[in-house]
């Protein structure tokens, strides 16, 4: 069992806290004028995405989480599982739809994404920051809508995602979308 002592807690390190893998988002070493020093830490639980703040004594230690991140290509889904392949080893990995969650609207076949494993079990996926998707339906607009330059309309994309787009986007357009915010970025020509 490998451990990190509290004075080695750094941003980006992954540890086990309360039997759950956590990511250290920030840590601050505090040495008060009187008393024992301590470390104030913000942890993000990787299974529930919950953010917690915790204070550890300088003598505390936590186990290092067995977290591995792979860059895999999305192949297909059968409704319950989503299948990915490692392009280096050609090993396939199936991920339950519950783990895919809201990211399924950003996945296209052959796109790469990061799959995070804990004890060789998938716990999360992270799609590319930007994806290019085809518009298959747009909301009807009124003739006077073009007066306001900040006007937008809803567009349905090939994966089923719905995003706000400028009025000039039409059915068949290829657009770039930021998967972190779900917002339109630009039109692809």
Swiss-Prot record:
Pathway: Protein biosynthesis; polypeptide chain elongation. Involved in peptide bond synthesis. Alleviates ribosome stalling that occurs when 3 or more consecutive Pro residues or the sequence PPG is present in a protein, possibly by augmenting the peptidyl transferase activity of the ribosome. Modification of Lys-34 is required for alleviation. The gene is efp. The keyword Cytoplasm applies. It is found in: Cytoplasm. One of its GO terms (molecular function) is translation elongation factor activity. NCBIfam families: efp, PRK00529.1. The modification N6-(3,6-diaminohexanoyl)-5-hydroxylysine is found at residue 34. GO terms for biological process: peptide biosynthetic process. Keywords: Cytoplasm, Elongation factor, Hydroxylation, Protein biosynthesis. One of its GO terms (cellular component) is cytoplasm. The keyword Membrane does not apply. This is Elongation factor P. May be beta-lysylated on the epsilon-amino group of Lys-34 by the combined action of EpmA and EpmB, and then hydroxylated on the C5 position of the same residue by EpmC (if this protein is present). Lysylation is critical for the stimulatory effect of EF-P on peptide-bond formation. The lysylation moiety may extend toward the peptidyltransferase center and stabilize the terminal 3-CCA end of the tRNA. Hydroxylation of the C5 position on Lys-34 may allow additional potential stabilizing hydrogen-bond interactions with the P-tRNA. Belongs to the elongation factor P family. Gene3D superfamilies: 2.30.30.30, Nucleic acid-binding proteins. It comes from Buchnera aphidicola subsp. Acyrthosiphon pisum (strain APS). Its main location: cytoplasm. Pfam families: EFP (PF01132), EFP_N (PF08207), Elong-fact-P_C (PF09285).
């Amino acid at each position: 069992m490998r451990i990190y002592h509290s004075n080695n807690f750094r941003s980006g390190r992954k540890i086990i806290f309360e039997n759950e893998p956590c990511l250290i988002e920030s840590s601050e070493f505090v040495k008060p004028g009187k008393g024992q020093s301590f470390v104030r830490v913000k942890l993000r639980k990787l299974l529930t995405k919950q953010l917690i703040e915790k204070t550890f004594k300088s003598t505390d230690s936590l186990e290092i989480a067995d977290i591995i991140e792979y860059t895999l290509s999305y192949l297909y889904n059968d409704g319950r599982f989503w299948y990915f392949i490692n392009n280096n080893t050609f090993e396939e990995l199936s991920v339950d739809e519950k783990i895919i969650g809201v990211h399924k609207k950003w996945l296209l076949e052959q796109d790469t994404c990061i799959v995070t494993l804990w004890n060789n079990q998938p716990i999360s996926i992270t799609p590319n920051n930007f994806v290019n998707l085809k518009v298959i339906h747009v909301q009807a607009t009124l003739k006077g809508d073009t007066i306001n330059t900040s006007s937008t309309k809803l567009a349905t994309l090939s994966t089923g995602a719905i995003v706000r787009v400028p009025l000039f986007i039409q059915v068949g357009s290829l657009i770039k979308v930021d998967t972190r915010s779900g917002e339109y970025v630009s039109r692809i020509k």
